């Protein structure tokens, strides 16, 4: 591989070091940032994901507020937990772990989150704030991508950026972040309806792939020296019958790109660091 690897794990560790200092300053004011998690059911993957969030909290001094409900919890019970977190001054932000059991109204649950305590930054109100340029919690994965590029001195101002994928958690909000005046990139959002995807990616300085299609971006689709960010994560079964996770970027891209954000070890750690950042910022605002 000739591409320079942009290490999200190391960068996230730097951010956590900075957050520890900020959390200590808050403690001197008598404030302890608190992150809440709402977990309904006992799915092992969801439990592991939530446990990882609370390990991150412990690393930087953020308090953990766990709310766990059985799989058969009623809509009213879930609503009550969210109301409690919305009104709890010890909670500065929280997430609802998805997916929820099928009998629950996911959209209703997400919209019940107090937008100011929306640690994921994906509440409709906060996405609207992003569109309008108003302050508010920012979506964690897009924010993490921008922060990772910035901390590795990847020029964004005036850069031609192609984002592949128009999902509400990454693609759409990422385009909004990159076109803010503070970034000033020129963004093309590609998707399943895009004609001649390669023509777009070959013209780009930066290609960010968040489509959930393993190996979608290949080495012949980029210009030599381009920056490539792999956001995709898909579980596939290998020839040996064992499951593994793979990204949207073919390994051969590393021989052509100038810099590569890999999967794993790239965007994932940055997403988690930005979740903590959103909570600490909320505590700092009071």
UniProtKB/Swiss-Prot annotation:
SUPFAM superfamilies: Aminoacid dehydrogenase-like, N-terminal domain (SSF53223), NAD(P)-binding Rossmann-fold domains (SSF51735). One of its GO terms (molecular function) is methylenetetrahydrofolate dehydrogenase (NADP+) activity. The keyword Amino-acid biosynthesis applies. GO terms for biological process: L-histidine biosynthetic process; methionine biosynthetic process; purine nucleotide biosynthetic process; tetrahydrofolate interconversion. GO terms for cellular component: cytosol. Keywords: Amino-acid biosynthesis, Histidine biosynthesis, Hydrolase, Methionine biosynthesis, Multifunctional enzyme, NADP, One-carbon metabolism, Oxidoreductase, Purine biosynthesis. NADP(+) binds at residues 165-167, 192, 233. Its EC number is 1.5.1.5, 3.5.4.9. It catalyses: (6R)-5,10-methylene-5,6,7,8-tetrahydrofolate + NADP(+) = (6R)-5,10-methenyltetrahydrofolate + NADPH; (6R)-5,10-methenyltetrahydrofolate + H2O = (6R)-10-formyltetrahydrofolate + H(+). Pathway: One-carbon metabolism; tetrahydrofolate interconversion. Catalyzes the oxidation of 5,10-methylenetetrahydrofolate to 5,10-methenyltetrahydrofolate and then the hydrolysis of 5,10-methenyltetrahydrofolate to 10-formyltetrahydrofolate. Homodimer. NCBIfam families: PRK14193.1. Belongs to the tetrahydrofolate dehydrogenase/cyclohydrolase family. PANTHER family: C-1-TETRAHYDROFOLATE SYNTHASE, CYTOPLASMIC, C-1-TETRAHYDROFOLATE SYNTHASE, CYTOPLASMIC-RELATED. This is Bifunctional protein FolD 2. It comes from Salinispora tropica (strain ATCC BAA-916 / DSM 44818 / JCM 13857 / NBRC 105044 / CNB-440). The gene is folD2.
């Amino acid at each position: 591989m000739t591409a320079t690897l942009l290490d999200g794990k190391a960068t996230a560790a730097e951010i956590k070091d900075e957050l520890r200092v900020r959390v200590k300053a808050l403690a001197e004011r008598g404030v302890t940032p608190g992150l809440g998690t709402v977990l309904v059911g006992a799915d092992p993957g969801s439990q592991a994901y939530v446990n990882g969030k609370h390990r991150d909290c412990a690393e930087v001094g953020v308090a953990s507020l766990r709310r766990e409900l059985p799989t058969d919890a009623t809509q009213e019970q879930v609503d009550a937990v969210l109301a409690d977190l919305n009104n709890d001054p010890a909670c500065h932000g929280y997430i609802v772990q998805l997916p929820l059991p099928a009998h629950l109204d996911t959209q209703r649950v997400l919209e019940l989150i107090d937008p100011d305590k929306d640690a994921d930054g994906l509440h409709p109100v906060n996405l609207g704030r992003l569109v309008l340029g108003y302050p508010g919690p920012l979506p964690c994965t897009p924010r993490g991508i921008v922060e990772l590029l910035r901390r590795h001195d990847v020029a964004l101002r005036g850069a031609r950026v192609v984002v592949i994928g128009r999902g509400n958690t990454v693609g759409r909000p990422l385009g909004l972040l990159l076109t803010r005046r503070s970034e000033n990139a020129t963004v093309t959002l590609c998707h399943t309806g895009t004609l001649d995807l390669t023509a777009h990616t070959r013209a780009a300085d930066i290609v960010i792939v968040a489509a959930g299609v393993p190996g979608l971006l290949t080495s012949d689709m980029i210009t030599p020296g381009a920056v490539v960010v792999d956001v995709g994560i898909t579980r596939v079964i290998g020839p040996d019958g064992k499951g593994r996770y793979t990204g949207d970027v073919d390994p051969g891209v590393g021989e052509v790109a100038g810099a590569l954000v890999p999967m794993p070890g790239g965007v994932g750690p940055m997403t988690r660091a930005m979740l903590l950042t959103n909570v600490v910022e909320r505590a700092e605002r009071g």
